[in-house]
Amino acid sequence: MTAPRAPGFTLVEVLVVVAIIAIAAGVAAVAWRDDPRATAEREARRFAGALEYAAARAQWRNETLGVSADGRAWRFWRRADDSARWLAVADDDVLSPRSIAADHTLVPLAYAGQPLPPDALIPLRPSGRNEPYAFVLDGAGIRLVVASDPLNHVSVVAANP
């Protein structure tokens, strides 16, 4: 007759479970690793969504808005009613200033077919009739153009460096 086994797991069973957990953790780490292209596309889409929202808000509220990008962040502006001064938009979470990923830059590229300086402010009119404009997002060997057409549809396309 054999002695009864003590309850619990054998060493082999414990090692098999540890091996399975290690393999799963390795697969998860590879899957969650930050892909530079995905980061750039996410930043560009986030900016494109804010541009479409700003163009619609300019029409809804009958106000002239503007957008600028200084390389590290973008910001939306509202033209003061009494002058040509631009005031930072502070009453809207979507249009609040946003920083972009550390290894990326965002600058204006063109407005109405003309190249722009890096400190340019692009207007978004209350009529909805805006000139085509574009911004360029560079980083990690990736260059994306965020462009708007006259109907305020914003697209993100890969550009040749």
Label every model-predicted segment:
Residues 1-3, 12, 16, 23-49, ...:
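N-terminal helix-rich module
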